């Protein structure tokens, strides 16, 4: 009897073989759910929430976040896979598949009496060797636009259908190249993702400027200005209550009038400063002048600005203030005391677009924008969500490629190369740990197998063809998902991120090892002691 049972008769315990069986079945259950998602030919999953909201997705990360997983081991694997996505932006589904397969292969040997500890030693040796192989086969190359487009396309085609992926690829790569600075880390927050429920998903485009999700608040303001100066400020142009809730006392109506006038004058002086600056820089020319303010602008101030032909937007989001100055230039101001023409940015075109109840302000034709907007369009909400998730992963894939300075061939080529190298390496490992290396090599082959299976080909036949081709030609051969035949991934331009594969090897081995070494599962929390 388990020791914990003596202390707490209500505790649930699974021991040795039973504990392992519970864990392996959890990993395989999760693997079966995500198996059909892998690769560009993977299928969709429809998630229906308790409130009846529908989400259509192929992205493993979204699935694992949205699914309610009860089983503790499955939940642990899901957390590891989503952490993989947080770190590298890709490889979630592969992570779950490889962990499930490592446990499945290990189970074959354990059922024949091999101790889990010996298998885990083999796993560790195999991981070290696999990382060496990865170092050898990575391709260091100049990250030009062509290469980045191949990397982004490989990532995006696994998330959305091919036609849309090709549209998004160009937009994603161009947005990264626009915000990239020499020898500085890439800040993906400088790419704003704005959604419009409008037209079809292939109308998604890159705006070399900014799109704000609100418009001017005065009917007389121009809807379109060209060659515009942009003033970004965080100054209140409305009367605000004091922060400490203090009040004023006045003896008579005259005093109250004076007080109101003083308040009004205080705001009007600020508006006058803006108007004077506009007259100074625009003169009699028909150049536009746009004020974008993070705080409020009251109706009187809006009226005064509209009379002067100034377009004013109030309550802009804080994240957009930083992007604005990067896109248009200029300096954001917290006070109007040191207002001068050097503080102004410039945009070639500013216009307002109305879509149903919503208004959007486009700031375009900026001279060298360091911040851009990806305008996502789609007919309904779940299409927009799906595209946004895909774009996020696409942006990360391009960023990783630039940061790594190298890429690895995709289409299962890396996994086949590692598996073949491990089988040769096996004979140099001492003792029974060889079996762990063999299990690791077999587990890696799940990726090309599932890619072939999801494309409708016989998985064993395809795998045999690829392995034969690999050993004969010595090239990095992957699966051609259109024909089921072997192909050289590098020639076709199918590239994966190096850091994704590296992270994959580390996290899968650690989690599979930990799960194999569990020989007792106890559910003996405080709740079990009640009653």
From Swiss-Prot:
Binding site for Mg(2+): 90
Compartments it resides in: Cytoplasm
Enzymatic class: hydrolase
A GO BP entry: positive regulation of establishment of protein localization to telomere
Major location (coarse): cytoplasm
Cross-link (Glycyl lysine isopeptide (Lys-Gly) (interchain with G-Cter in SUMO2)), chain numbering: 251
Location of Phosphoserine modifications: 205
Gene Ontology MF terms in the entry: ATP binding; ATP hydrolysis activity; ATP-dependent protein folding chaperone; unfolded protein binding; WD40-repeat domain binding
Residue numbers binding ADP: 39, 91-94, 158-159, 411, 496
Residue positions, PTM N6-acetyllysine: 5, 199, 287, 365, 377, 388
Keywords: Acetylation, ATP-binding, Chaperone, Cytoplasm, Hydrolase, Isopeptide bond, Magnesium, Metal-binding, Nucleotide-binding, Phosphoprotein, Ubl conjugation
EC number: 3.6.1.-
Residue list for modification N-acetylalanine: 2
Superkingdom of source: Eukaryota
Catalytic reaction annotation: ATP + H2O = ADP + phosphate + H(+)
A GO cellular component annotation in the UniProt record: microtubule
Residue numbers binding ATP: 39, 91-93, 411-412, 496, 501
CDD domains linked: TCP1_zeta
Pfam families (alphabetical): Cpn60_TCP1
Sequence similarity: Belongs to the TCP-1 chaperonin family.
Function: Component of the chaperonin-containing T-complex (TRiC), a molecular chaperone complex that assists the folding of actin, tubulin and other proteins upon ATP hydrolysis. The TRiC complex mediates the folding of WRAP53/TCAB1, thereby regulating telomere maintenance.
Assembly: Component of the chaperonin-containing T-complex (TRiC), a hexadecamer composed of two identical back-to-back stacked rings enclosing a protein folding chamber. Each ring is made up of eight different subunits: TCP1/CCT1, CCT2, CCT3, CCT4, CCT5, CCT6A/CCT6, CCT7, CCT8. Interacts with PACRG.
PANTHER family per record: CHAPERONIN
Protein name: T-complex protein 1 subunit zeta
Organism field: Oryctolagus cuniculus
């Amino acid at each position: 009897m388990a020791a914990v049972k003596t202390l707490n008769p209500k505790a649930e315990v699974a021991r040795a073989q039973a504990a392992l069986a519970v864990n392996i079945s959890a990993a395989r259950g999760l693997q079966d759910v995500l198996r059909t998602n892998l690769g560009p030919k993977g299928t969709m999953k429809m998630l229906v929430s308790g409130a009846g909201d529908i989400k259509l997705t192929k992205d493993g990360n979204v699935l694992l976040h949205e699914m309610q997983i009860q089983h503790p081991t499955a939940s642990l694997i899901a957390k590891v896979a989503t952490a993989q996505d947080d770190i590298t932006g890709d490889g979630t589904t592969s992570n779950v598949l490889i962990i499930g397969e490592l446990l499945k292969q290990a189970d074959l040997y354990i059922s024949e009496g091999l101790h889990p500890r010996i298998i885990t030693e083999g796993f560790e040796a195999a991981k070290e060797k696999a990382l060496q192989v990865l170092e050898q086969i990575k391709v260091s190359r100049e990250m030009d636009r062509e290469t980045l487009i191949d990397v982004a396309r490989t990532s995006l085609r696994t998330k959305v259908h091919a036609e849309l992926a090709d549209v998004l690829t160009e937009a994603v790569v161009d947005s990264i190249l626009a915000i990239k600075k020499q020898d500085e880390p890439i800040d993906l927050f400088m790419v704003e993702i704005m959604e419009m429920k409008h037209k079809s998903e292939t109308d998604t485009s890159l705006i070399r400027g900014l799109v704000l999700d609100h418009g001017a608040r005065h009917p007389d303001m121009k809807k379109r200005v060209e060659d515009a100066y942009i003033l970004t400020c965080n100054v209140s142009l409305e009367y605000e209550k004091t922060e400490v809730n203090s009040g004023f006392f006045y003896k008579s109506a005259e005093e109250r009038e004076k007080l109101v006038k003083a308040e009004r004058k205080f705001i009007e002086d600020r508006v006058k400063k803006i108007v004077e600056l506009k007259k100074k820089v625009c003169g009699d020319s028909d150049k536009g002048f746009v004020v974008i303010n993070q705080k409020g602008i009251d109706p009187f101030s809006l009226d005064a600005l509209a009379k002067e032909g100034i377009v004013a937007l109030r309550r802009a989001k804080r994240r957009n203030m930083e992007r604005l100055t990067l896109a248009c230039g200029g300096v954001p101001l917290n006070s109007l005391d040191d207002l001068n023409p050097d503080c102004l940015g410039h945009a070639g075109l500013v216009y307002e677009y109305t879509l149903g109840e919503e208004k959007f302000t486009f700031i375009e034709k900026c001279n060298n924008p360091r911040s851009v907007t990806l305008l996502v369009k789609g007919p309904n909400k779940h299409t927009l969500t799906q595209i946004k998730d895909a774009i996020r992963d696409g942006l990360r894939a391009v960023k990783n490629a630039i940061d790594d300075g190298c890429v690895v061939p995709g289409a299962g080529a890396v996994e086949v190369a590692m598996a073949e190298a491990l089988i040769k390496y096996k004979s140099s490992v001492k003792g029974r740990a060889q079996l762990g290396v063999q299990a690791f090599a077999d587990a890696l082959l799940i990726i090309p197998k599932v890619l072939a299976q999801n494309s409708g080909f016989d998985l064993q036949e395809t795998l045999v063809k690829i392995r034969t081709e690999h050993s004969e030609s010595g090239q990095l051969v992957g699966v051609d998902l259109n024909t089921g035949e072997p192909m050289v991934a590098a020639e076709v331009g199918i590239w994966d991120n190096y850091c994704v594969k590296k992270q994959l090897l580390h996290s899968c081995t650690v989690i599979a090892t930990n799960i194999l070494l569990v020989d007792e599962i106890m559910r003996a929390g405080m709740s079990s002691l009640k009653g």
